Amino acid sequence: MNTPLKPKHGQKTNRKPKANKPVVKKQQTKQPPTHKVQGEEVAAVKSGLHPRNRHRGQYDFPALIKVVPELQSHVMKNPKGQWTINFADPISVKLLNKALLVLHYGVTYWDIPEGFLCPPIPGRADYIHRVADLLLKGNPQLNHSQVRALDIGVGANCIYPIVGVTEYGWSWVGSDVDPVSIQQASLIVQSNSKLQGHIECRLQKNSQHIFNGIIGANERYTVTTCNPPFHASLADAQQGTQRKLTNLQANQRKKGRLATPTLSHSRLNFGGQKAELWCPGGEAAFIGKMAVESQQFAQQVLWFSTLISKGDNVRGMKKQLEKLGAQSIHVIEMAQGQKISRFIAWSFQNAEQRKLWWQAKC
């Protein structure tokens, strides 16, 4: 065996010196996973709140209280000395949402009837910003005033159109099967000069339809959005509400805060009406029906999209869209704190057809 020669004093050696600190290797950023749809690679993106999201960081409670003074009596300090609210209290959540809309989006009137869905605005805004990125990727010189969007299930809160109009100047149609939701959403639009002329609310008269009965024969939409019903039955929805409330109360007790609201008092922030929360077959059935109907409007809509709450439903939805002939599918994940959500977007038009769409200035 050859014995390695010891280097002479001052002579360089290739042997690595021992060190107390570990050697840190430069890590390359991993590329997001992709899948191919008829020749196109599609990325699944995961990140935190969008850079353009106005709700990054802590809530500015002094500013929020200034625009909605009623919020002040609902604000408290957590054990860390940070201002917050009791998110198990429906009135607190509603007032926070109202203040966020007034402060950040210039809304002068916003309200929802008792028992209707009061969605977390930061996550809803993230969906719109990432949809905007999808459109900008296909057309970097996008004129946002040319974008026409359709929100399926606009709800009484009208959140997606509000964000889309105030942030980007898009025009919207919001549909819903519930007459009260349409009435309230219309009142919000009529009561805000910023929204007037930019949002139209339409009643879906057939609860078995999604796009049929809403998209007119000569209408074209740049994109559709949707927050689909998650549960398969009223019982499932009630159990889900109770589970969320229990988890939140346990978390608050752990942080030294009292959490007393019961299920009957939590309908506003965790609840919602039938069409908002459940439908036969749950989320999988709803988005499956949406996929099938979307094929009928393949040439009238550039991009379809919907949130998917249950990660297990993504794979089935992608397979169904591929069978239906979708040319491009994007699965975009979003992170709000510890919560991961995602939406899926698809188009039946290939890259060249999408380019021609923009050239036609829809």
From Swiss-Prot:
Enzyme class, UniProt record, top EC level: transferase
GO biological process per UniProt: rRNA base methylation
UniProt GO MF annotations: 23S rRNA (adenine(1618)-N(6))-methyltransferase activity
One GO CC term, this protein: cytoplasm
Location within or outside the cell: Cytoplasm
Chain residue ranges for the region called Disordered: 1-40
Keyword Glycoprotein in record: no
UniProt catalytic activity: adenosine(1618) in 23S rRNA + S-adenosyl-L-methionine = N(6)-methyladenosine(1618) in 23S rRNA + S-adenosyl-L-homocysteine + H(+)
SUPFAM superfamilies (alphabetical): S-adenosyl-L-methionine-dependent methyltransferases (SSF53335)
Any single Pfam family the record assigns to this protein: Methyltransf_10
EC number: 2.1.1.181
Basic residues bias (residue ranges): 1-28
Record keywords: Cytoplasm, Methyltransferase, rRNA processing, S-adenosyl-L-methionine, Transferase
Family in the record: Belongs to the methyltransferase superfamily. METTL16/RlmF family.
HAMAP family: 23SrRNA_methyltr_F
Record NCBIfam families: PRK11727.1 (NF008725)
Function: Specifically methylates the adenine in position 1618 of 23S rRNA.
Protein name, UniProt field: Ribosomal RNA large subunit methyltransferase F
Species annotation: Vibrio cholerae serotype O1 (strain M66-2)
Gene: rlmF
